[in-house]
Amino acid sequence: MNQPSVIKLRELLDLLPHRYPFLLVDKVLSYDIEARSITAQKNVTINEPFFMGHFPNAPIMPGVLILEALAQAAGVLIGLVLENDRNKRIALFLGIQKAKFRQAVRPGDVLTLQADFSLISSKGGKAWAQARVDSQLVTEAELSFALVDKESI
């Protein structure tokens, strides 16, 4: 069932190990644990540190960071699924398949991050993820994750 509540920044910090300047999810718009699906948001501002060098006169969000934002959104859902185990285990980004970059992301854009898992197990997971700006598909990829004990890293 689709959860009605939005997950805002303070709660995200309990679900993800990332912090500024590498936290690339601003809030979760919706999630469905049973369907293994999540939709999150990243507000792309001119103040992002990466825009200083990518590119100063024509700022574009690096594609690898769009993929990272998608992975972080997926990581939030893994944290919600783990529930009682999330203090002991962590999802590590394992791989990217079938990545396509269709459109540039610029300051002022709002990225909508969608991840739908085909697999979540005790060892890891696999999700199809898409990023959109104004309903236009900008990036898509298959993401895979490994679940490991936090003490082992």
UniProtKB/Swiss-Prot annotation:
Its EC number is 4.2.1.59. GO terms for biological process: fatty acid biosynthetic process; lipid A biosynthetic process. It is an enzyme of class 4 (lyase). One of its GO terms (molecular function) is (3R)-hydroxyacyl-[acyl-carrier-protein] dehydratase activity. It is found in: Cytoplasm. The active site is at 54. Its main location: cytoplasm. Disulfide bonds: none annotated. Involved in unsaturated fatty acids biosynthesis. Catalyzes the dehydration of short chain beta-hydroxyacyl-ACPs and long chain saturated and unsaturated beta-hydroxyacyl-ACPs. It comes from Chlamydia pneumoniae (Chlamydophila pneumoniae). This is 3-hydroxyacyl-[acyl-carrier-protein] dehydratase FabZ. The keyword Lipid biosynthesis applies.
